[in-house]
Amino acid sequence: MFTKILIANRGEIACRVAATACAMGIKTVAVYSEADAASKHVAVCDEAVLIGPAAAQESYLCGDKIIAVALATGAQAVHPGYGFLSENADFAEACEQAGLVFIGPPASSMRAMGSKSAAKTLMETANVPLVPGYHGEQQDPDFLQREADRIGYPVLLKASAGGGGKGMRVIEKADDFKAALASCKREAISSFGDDKVLAEKYLTRPRHIEIQVFADTHGNCVYLHERDCSVQRRHQKVLEEAPAPGMSQERRAAMGEAAVAAAKAVGYVGAGTVEFIANQDGSFYFMEMNTRLQVEHPVTEMITGTDLVEWQLRVAAGQPLPKTQAELAIHGHAIEARIYAENPEKGFLPSIGTLRHMDTPQAVAFELGGTPGGAPAPVRIDSGVREGDAISPFYDPMIAKLIVWGADRTQALARMSQALAEFRIVGLATNIAFLKRLVEGSAFASADLDTGLIERNADTLFPPPKAAPLGALALAAVALMESEKELSASKSANPADPWGNALGWRLNSDYQRQLAFADDYCATRGMSAYELGVTYRAHGWEIAAGGIEAELSLTARKGADFSIKLGATSMHGTVRRDADMFHVFTGGRHFALTYNDPMAHAGEAEAAGGRLTAPMPGKVVAVITAKGRTVKKGDPLVIMEAMKMEHTIAAPADGLVEDILYQVGDQVADGAPLLEFKAA
């Protein structure tokens, strides 16, 4: 067994590999970019070496630098994680030539399966069913358009070297083909260095089911059953579960055996995933093989009682697989939710910022937990960030993977809902509320699964903002007034003096004040804020809002956790303050309320309109309009790239482009004006 390995990755997967290596007594070496100098993966490894600037092309994608670090630190093997160089056959080959063990499949297997088009050809030869499409070398746009017309719309374009939902476009009609192809190729070259694409018939209600396979150097190959990854947005997985709901033993065996056959056909070694598109009628088609560990591997670990990273290390060291096919039974049900820094209500745009507060449910991390030979821990959280860390525009905005296990799917669903309610993040937008709606929605609960689930249930998954309840406003008001009291006391020479505090104490009278909090609901209704009238009493307050009056008192407090009594109702909640923003977590919901301090913004003028601004930091990759051009509402004007995903800024109304302020290739800051626009 190895005594030291280098982990050629960052974030959650680097921490995941380090955890298993540590448990096995193996020393670890981390590599990091300048942006990651204070990152968690740097802290958890035994050694860490800087390899370059923030841009992945100058750091995590520099195989020669990584190999040099491995040799200099005495590492015997390199674990690539997922993403970056994990499916780069040239890197795997270079490791072997340098005398390092690449913890993954042989370069030949990666080349065979790494190209989607080559893999499709290979599977066709092996009589594995394929979705109708074009997987050849010809990349002329006119030729590809003719192939798309032949296949029939809707057509799915995919980067041949791609993965993770990047470089994919669904095209509904022929008129949209050329623009979608150009965008797909730009994203493909940016993400994978290869703009080759393939085209396939897009199935309207398919399920995405993948099989975890594992092979060793002794001729053994097994499947560790399936994962259902049908719930996706932008072709990226949101929820994954194992086993797949409604999967019969016969179909499971058929898909598992097909996956093993695919792995054996390319002389596979190590962990791999064979992905299938499954139709509602039970038929399935080969989609691709990922020649690495998957993001969602924990759900397989939880139902099979295995540590897949340990398996990777043992197989790479030349040992046989720890279990046979007969020993790989399914126990219980596991679900994984990917918690991202993103705004689902704004097209899942990434959210850049600092994790000012992060409260999580009680959970194990990077392990099965539970008791040896017994059930695994009910909740697991795999995360590569900590409170205080920044989510930057350079890398994937994942905050954590939340994994739950239950004796059956019903119990797992209940545990997921509860765990999401206990996740509290302040500092940037997240998809937690969206995930909670998704998990609790009737479609997912009833296992009515397919890759269009999110779009089909958009009305319930993306509801319009609702008014904050009086209880949430009361909790914010109490937190505000308590913080004022503490500030006043800290500045007073005699904190007990009623004349020197902010308790609202007045001689012979009850002090009254107005508080104003605003949220997204206020903005959609044209309201400036929720107005709360507060009257200070001897043992609490009386509040009035929206024609409702109620007595209010603070019954208990521990840090940011408040217990209040509002009228006859007792309530509990956590309130985290971030400048003028009060984040109220109560009843499994998160209310972001901005306090409109009457003194803080006195004299400020409203900024002049007429400019379209960048929704996030990123790079301008295309300017589709020109100065002086008249445009229609919805016309694409500028395309930005952030985190290797493209985002189109469109005209908000009919109007005139008066000036363009950035050129292709320019980096722009969040909120930077991109162009001057005059509405008609």
Task: Please give the residue ranges for each predicted region.
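Structured, non-catalytic alpha/beta "coupling" segments that mediate domain-domain communication
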Residues: 87-94, 336, 346, 449-450, ...
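Short, well-ordered beta-strand elements within core beta-sheets of diverse protein domains
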Residues: 168-170, 201, 247, 398-407, ...
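Catalytic cores of soluble metabolic enzymes centered on carboxylation/carboxyl-transfer
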Residues: 259, 298-549, 670-676
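Long, charged amphipathic helices and adjacent flexible linkers at domain junctions
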Residues: 323-331, 455-458, 462, 589-614
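Structured functional modules or segments
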Residues: 602-680
